[in-house]
Design a protein with these regions (language model features):
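Nucleic-acid endonuclease domains
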Residues: 1-66, 73-171
Length: 171
């Protein structure tokens, strides 16, 4: 897991690519979702050294890295993520990406964690289907049907970034 301090520049760039006027079906945080998601995209794009999309581009993925279409999923957190933290996407979305990167974003937007990454084909093999209305042991209740893996199921982004023999070695 890679911890990242959020800078004012990152916040500014996230506001530029987010669209606060759009509230997508099945998002978890209402109109804030665009900004939260954009901030997660900025974190991953900066780490990978690529450019994220802008708010008029691409539904199926957020950026391209090493010929892989990357979709970033960001979750607002009140505490740093752990190995057992959920990484999920709602079943509503049918995005056509090659890889998912998962980011945990501290509620005050001061820090983020790139929790890991996984090829989309492997995500759906490993993910558990969680039905709307299911309540976790910590009291959180899912508002939508979700596909869920844990942080421990993801590949380390440091290993993926340093790998020169092909991504399949680590994913």
């Amino acid at each position: 897991m890679k911890e990242v301090s959020i800078t004012d520049d990152m916040r500014k760039r996230a506001r530029l690519i987010s669209n606060p006027d759009v509230v997508f079906n099945q998002n978890k945080t209402g109109s804030r979702a665009g900004y939260i998601g954009a901030l997660g995209e900025i974190v991953v794009a900066d780490y990978l050294g690529v450019k994220p999309h802008n708010n008029n581009e691409v539904y199926n993925y957020d950026m391209v890295w090493n010929d892989n279409n990357i979709e970033v999923k960001t979750m607002n957190l009140y505490y740093p993520p752990k190995e057992g933290t959920d990484c999920c996407t709602t079943t509503y979305y049918d995005q056509k990406c090659d890889m998912y990167f998962f980011v945990g974003l501290l509620n005050d937007k001061s820090k983020a964690w790139i929790e890991g990454c996984i090829y989309s084909k492997d995500f759906f093999k490993k993910a558990n289907y969680i039905k709307k209305g299911t309540t976790r042991s910590d009291g959180f209740t899912y508002k939508w049907d979700n596909w869920v893996v844990k942080v421990k199921d993801l590949s380390s982004v440091d290993k993926v970034l340093s790998n020169t023999t092909g991504l399949d070695t680590f994913l």
